A protein has these predicted regions:
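A structural boundary/capping signal
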Residues: 1-187
Length: 187
């Protein structure tokens, strides 16, 4: 297989927008699939991931309210991962969740996959979740304009994180997600 183009520029703390741009790039490049956008969270919105650039120290986890990556065939694209921005799924899982499910239950991840084509049409973020009450940014925003859904919606992010909303796939635990990744193209 020929070498794939480099990842698109990414903005720290805006993983959902990074994933949108990366999914768009890989779809347009015609990379073999499946191509999915994967949301990682849990009902407590306290999900521990290791090997993340935002970690307080190397080897320590960062606790995200949510994280978003892109699956391309058997690879995971995660520009926040210190082990590599594009890794085989098993390597990304080992780096990001080195303790498996042997952590406090409140930090256990849940995963929901969205087909990239669907995600690219309906995702939108006006970045309101990244602003303080006075309107200032919690973290510097990306240079690109906010993403607007094809239907003109400006903020659909909450629906992607809702554990009560029916999505294209159910929220699943680490083992089920790893099993789905182990058989690219058959799930």
């Amino acid at each position: 297989m020929p070498a794939m183009p480099a990842l698109v520029p990414a903005q720290p703390y805006y993983c959902e927008e990074n994933a949108w741009h990366e999914a768009k790039r890989v779809v347009e490049a015609g990379e073999p699939g499946p191509i999915e956008v994967v949301f990682i969270s849990n009902p407590a919105r306290q999900c521990a991931l290791w090997a993340q650039r935002a970690a307080p120290k190397p080897g320590e986890p960062v606790v995200w309210d949510y994280h978003v990556v892109v699956r391309v065939g058997g690879d995971i694209l995660d520009p926040d991962c210190t082990a590599g921005a594009r890794l085989p799924a098993a390597a990304w899982l080992a780096a990001s969740f080195p303790h498996g499910e042997e952590i406090f239950s409140r930090y256990l991840p849940r995963f929901r996959r969205y087909p990239a084509g669907q995600f690219l049409m309906v995702f939108a973020s006006d970045r309101r979740h990244m602003r303080r009450p006075d309107g200032t940014h919690l973290k510097p925003p990306p240079a690109w304009p906010p993403i607007v859904a094809r239907d003109g919606s400006v903020h659909t992010l909450p629906a992607f994180l809702d554990f009560d909303t029916v999505g294209p796939t159910p929220w699943v635990g680490l083992r089920a997600f790893a099993a789905a990744l182990a058989t690219p193209g058959t799930d």
